Amino acid sequence: MINNAARSLLCEQFIANNTIDPKLYDRYVVKRGLRNSDGTGVMAGLTNICNVHGYVVNEGEKSPIQGQLIFRGYNINDLVSNAQKENRFGYEEIVYLLLMGDLPNREELTAFKGMMAENRPLPDNFFEDMILKAPSKNIMNKMARAILALYSYDDNPENRSPEYEMATAISIISKLPNIMVSAYQVKKRCYDGESLFMHPLIPTHSTAEMILSALRPDRQFTEEEAKILDLLLMLHAEHGGGNNSTFACRVLTSSGTDPYSAYSAAIGSLKGPRHGGANLKVAAMHQCIKDNVQNWEDEGEIADFLTKILNKEAFDHTGLVYGMGHAVYTLSDPRAVILRENAKKMAENTEFEREYKLLEAVERLTPELFKKIKGSDKAMCANVDMYSGFVYSMLGIPEDLYTPMFAVSRMAGWCAHRFEELVTGKRIIRPAYKAVSVEKKYIPLDER
């Protein structure tokens, strides 16, 4: 172990030699974060899988519009509303759509659900060897390690045939919820001192039902609870090729590596607080607001505290209202709109109704306060994180699983993008970095 003094000295040297003058980025016209100056993403590829539409550009000017999320040509609003109209679970249909490119008929969907049920169980001794014997405080870390470990249980993991890739994708999508719940139960036992319980899987369960059944000691849940969790899985399943985790998956895929490595990297990306981990920031901020606003129905008091947050005087002092704003969406995030409507219905006449109204007030008040305090006319809307954590809390799902739930859902999108990259990519993704270091003459060791 490095002592504190040595560590501090090394860190000073590390920081000094790894800092680049910000002016150089402008001089060499570097698109930092692969973003254009107006915040839009640099065009790095083409995709048939998903369209995330939040603005239009007219004569070089970015104009805000109502957001649209389209999976394989189908609007997310239509996919959700039809599943609800027919009173059935929709996530498995979304998975099929993303992987295969079109909607299944009844027979195809039934067969596909059967494939997912068959693939949910973990390999023999996997739970004991890979999860129970090596617990992790962070479930995302454990999920990434578990996906990598599945490579060793595969008879032919370097096979790149379409048949193998499809079978592996269905296997991983099906197993990941089981891995998540298993890792969480072990974490509770090893780090929280709670009892460990593992329920046998029920083959007829949907993905949402399987998760709720596995998490609860008595296995009991209502249809309303399972349907709103299914809705969350649908909304998080895919979001274009440019988001960090999907791009990471495509970057690794372009190198020719195996699917386990590519999907594990995507989980590692989603774990980051600037990406999937942002939902934990939203939950923490909401708790801070609840603790500091005495009257949740007083919009003036709510606005005063939001002003403190925006002025970097409260919460984490970053000046950010988490859950508000998005890199693409401007006037609305369709996922947030759908989730807000369903969260409202679920919260009505329950202990959660007051909290829902508080979140609604935060969403309504923040854009004008942001404009007033920051002096910006930038369009701002609530993103899906504004209400996802709230719905998870109504379901009794712990914060430890907020981002892992995101990963469970998004695995379908990652798999679809890997397929597309394998079929159409044909070259390794390799952007350029300009060296700005100064040439130095080597100094012999004794003369330094």
Task: Put a short name on every predicted segment.
Residues 1-448:
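Non-transmembrane, aqueous-exposed alpha-helical and coiled segments at domain scale
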